[in-house]
């Protein structure tokens, strides 16, 4: 299944690159010096697998592909990484391989600016997802507040959810294993995590996000089990 290969690529990225061998004829690889480009590429593929977008696949990404549909380089600056537009809402996904305390300095301003621009562009709710191998607590604090002043000093409260790649991978797998691979499940997670951001500090919010991921996965699994039982009883 394509989604399983996508999850395997994510696992390689979490490890910082490497190879995964299925058999002698099937090997996937993330070159260690190309992890930023591959992170954007695999999150793009994950978005296409979840599907239901109203914009075209090439409109979602800002990076270029080679003849084998592998990433040539990461997207340039000036705009967000992945714009996934659905019928009722838009999710802007930003990714980084940065894990140090410099993460907030490099990503805090541009991510908020890109989400702000998207809020002004789309005539529908816009949600941000920030995905990194590790989320620095200062980055989480910036997105917890989510404040941005647009042109004309218009104050915006942005919804940006910071997730580790491991958390996203686990949620992604659960969506497919339970038959809930749809963008609404991502929005549910974002909205659930945002409910607590005003009453928690950054370390507590990071812990709550981790708990929320597990709770949402558990809910999907329980619903799948109850649906199976109902189907069996009907038969």
Predicted region positions:
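Catalytic core segments in nucleotide and nucleic-acid processing enzymes
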Residues: 2-221
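Nuclease-adjacent, charged terminal/linker segments that flank catalytic cores
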Residues: 1, 224-235
